[in-house]
Each structure stands twice: as structure tokens, then as C-alpha cells.
Amino acid sequence: MREIYISDGYTNSVKDKCKYWLQTGDTSVFTEEELNTIRVFVQVDQSGAEALIVAYDCIAGDYRKLFIHGIKPHVYVGLKLFADKWYQEAIDARLTITEDDILRLSMTKIEDLKKNPAWTDTKNLIASSDNWPSSRRYYYHAKQTCHSANYGIEASTFIMNILEKSAGKVVLSREQGEYFLNTYRALFPEIVERCQRIEEQAKKYRMLYNMFGFPYTITSYEVTKNIYKELYAWGAQSTVAEITRIAYSRMQEFIEAEKKKWDILADTHDSYLLQCPLLDVKECSTKAKEFMNQRLVSPIDNTEFNMKSECNIGFNWSPFKKEVNEVGLQEIQW
């Protein structure tokens, strides 16, 4: 069993108090000494991260619209890939979604999806499929398609990646793998164009740039298919990593300037982890998100946009799970 890190001052003797506080924000249950000694973890993750960067590194199209209108790509792609499944799944889940609802949603423009009364139940149904048996993990299939197709993966590698990531539980046929990837690329041809553009730039100039303007020099003797995936991914991955580095540095400067009793504990590519006193959690959360939500500019059309982020707090560095880890990292509702 792997070690789970806990925040300073937390012990099982205060578990019930901490659980209550996470639910309510009420600190009156703690003694003055506990308020001074117990720390809480604050973790801020980039929301969208590489996918958002890819959207603004593409010609403006439907992929970018997903982020503008707050539609999760995995859900949208799940709707499109498995449009023939959702009506029966809705019946089994005892939802009032009709076959006509599914048909209309699958044909609706991205900017109009939220106007359809059936959208909320449908998107929740799609997302919930991530926890279904492997043959019906439609959300998982869509998620892996999004992650892989953005970087030019081929069907055989895609099928093997899913098999490995699911520990052998999700097995796709060649036909399914090709269908998923071809459907995705038909939905978002701007992503195909981006890959082609990166190939051409790499061959012509042997240098790429991320959204902060920092270069990547290609030192391979030849720019061949073997390194295409690395080239497609570099701009988004390095931009995401640099956003976190900048946020980390700005937070440390703020802590020192304001003499805050906060500690930065981890930098994990697209997120960072802090701990702070219970009474500081809202200020710490707000600042941590502020530093992460940086302004960026599309190199394609100079459109300005912000990285988005989400914050979770808890008393150990592991996700919340009901009846298993109820003081784990979770979004606060107060």
C-alpha cells in the first residue's frame, strides 16, 4: 500500500472535526491550539491544461468552441462516438431522456448545447459511464481518444495504449480504434492542420516555440515520423509546465513578502500543492488560483485567453472517497 501524505498537525483524533469543517467551513469546533497547529492541503490544478493550449494553437474552430462555451471535450466526443448507445443507457438509468433528445443533441451546434433541457442529464450520464464495466466505459474511450488524437497517434498504437492504461480491461478492435480516431479528426480538422503545420515548421526551421515564446531546437539529424508525436506535444506540454513554474514562483514571492505561514509542498507539472492554517484556506485558495490563471495569447490569431484552474482541499494528499477517505482532497462548497 502506498504512503499517503498528511498535512502538518492532522491526526485521527481530530478527524471528525476536520470532516465537519470540510463540509461546513465552521471553525468553531476547533480549539485555539488546533487552529494554530493544524494545516490543510490546498491543491490547484490547471483545468483543461494541454487541451486548452492546443485549442488556441489551432485555427479557431469547434475544438476551441468547447472551451469557450464550457463543454467538456470528453463528454462531447462521448456523445458523438456513441450516439447510438445513450438512449438505451438512459432507459436503464431511468432518465427521461428520449431517443429524439439524443438525436437532437448529437446534431446541435456546440454553442447551443446548454440550451437543450436534456443536456444536463445527458452529459451527467456520459460522465458516469467512466465507472461502468469496461465494455461500456464510453467516457473512458472518449477521454483516451481526445488525449491521443491531439498528438497524431495511429490506430495500432492507440489500441495498445488503451490496453496498457486500463491494465488489460479495455480491449478495442482495429475497426473500433480507427473509427474513434477518424471520427475525432472529422469533428476537429483544425487539429489535423496543427499537426501538419508543426511538421512543416520542424522540417523547415528545426525549431518550435511555446506560447511564452521559448524555443525548442530539434537536434535530430532528420525530422522523421518517429519524433512527430514528441513535436506535436511539446508546445502544449511545455506551456502547461511553464504556467505552473510561474505560479509556483509568484506564490513563493507572495508568501515571503506577506510573511504568510504557508508552505509550497509540490510542483506536479499542471498543479501545485500548498498547506496553510485552517483560517487562511480561502485566501490561500484564491491566491493559488489567481497565480495559475495566467493570460495567454494564441500565436495563430492573437486571441487572448486565460488558463483556468480548480482547487481542492483536504488533510491528506489523496482524492476524497466517500466512506473511505472523507478528509481527502475535495472541492469546498462554502
Predicted feature locations:
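Conserved catalytic core of nucleotide polymerization and phosphodiester-bond processing enzymes
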Residues: 1-334
